[in-house]
Amino acid sequence: MAKRLDLNDVNIYYGDFHAVQDVNLHIPPKAVTAFIGPSGCGKSTVLRTLNRMHEVIPGAYVKGEILLDGEDIYGPKIDPVAVRNTIGMVFQKANPFPTMSIEENVVAGLKLSGEKNKKKLREVAERALRGANLWDEVKDRLDKPGGGLSGGQQQRLCIARAIAVEPEVLLMDEPCSALDPISTLAVEDLIHELKEDFTIVIVTHNMQQAARVSDQTAFYSLEATGKPGQLVEVGPTKQIFENPTKKETEDYISGRFG
């Protein structure tokens, strides 16, 4: 079951550097929320805090609350690995395990969790590949290396790997930036289907993509280089693109800066 996320007074730091300040944001379930904004504004940084991925960077920490259906994912008794199973991540560059087979790629997370039943692993692989709209393209070569797929297929393989562990939320950090237009369209179509089962947050530099795939858009910016990024405006995507309330948002959407 998809879950909501709520960010309350979130501030993100890398050591002494204040990267993002005072973010308050509601991310609804079974919808796509897009993060947009100029480079360096903190949108990918915020995305990575949503499943504690930023913690792999020494000195990184968060102040404030990030709640998943009301539970603080930074609570003292919360296991970061469990958070990352519940809130999956798809990265900018497709990163399948190149020497693993297609099927092994999809079920890698389950195997790490101790699942050994071959029948169940095969069933999960098929379900996840179907969910990623990839099954019909690879069903006759599941034993072939994942690294042998095209770029667009590799990205959908990574999406299949993410959804195989049945997360509640799916984070996507510029998932189409390295793809050709046809592969991009395939991933965008997939995002529309996935939101029926998952809460989705996507970072994108592509304004047209944000307008096409998202239900809600959050615009981030920063006053100057070296200053913290901040959430300027959030609202329904149609409103943000057609009638934003902040001039800074309008300037960015219209291409006057960024």
UniProtKB/Swiss-Prot annotation:
Cellular-component GO terms for this entry: plasma membrane
Keyword tags: ATP-binding, Cell membrane, Membrane, Nucleotide-binding, Phosphate transport, Translocase, Transport
Enzyme class of the recorded protein, top EC level: translocase
Catalytic activity: phosphate(out) + ATP + H2O = ADP + 2 phosphate(in) + H(+)
Protein origin, superkingdom: Bacteria
SUPFAM superfamilies hit by this protein: P-loop containing nucleoside triphosphate hydrolases (SSF52540)
Domain ABC transporter: start-end pairs: 5-253
EC number of the protein: 7.3.2.1
Location of this chain's protein in the cell: Cell membrane
Residues where ATP binds: G37, P38, S39, G40, C41, G42, K43, S44
Membrane topology, as annotated: Peripheral membrane protein
GO molecular function ontology, one term from the record: ATPase-coupled phosphate ion transmembrane transporter activity
Residue ranges of coiled coil: none
Biological-process GO terms, alphabetical: phosphate ion transmembrane transport
CDD domains referenced in this protein's UniProt entry, alphabetically: ABC_PstB_phosphate_transporter
InterPro entries xrefs: AAA+_ATPase, ABC_transporter-like_ATP-bd, ABC_transporter-like_CS, P-loop_NTPase, PstB-like
Family assignment from sequence similarity: Belongs to the ABC transporter superfamily. Phosphate importer (TC 3.A.1.7) family.
Function of the molecule: Part of the ABC transporter complex PstSACB involved in phosphate import. Responsible for energy coupling to the transport system.
Annotated PANTHER family: ABC TRANSPORTER I FAMILY MEMBER 17
Subunit comment: The complex is composed of two ATP-binding proteins (PstB), two transmembrane proteins (PstC and PstA) and a solute-binding protein (PstS).
Protein name (database record): Phosphate import ATP-binding protein PstB
Organism: Corynebacterium jeikeium (strain K411)
Lineage: Bacteria, Bacillati, Actinomycetota, Actinomycetes, Mycobacteriales
Primary gene name: pstB
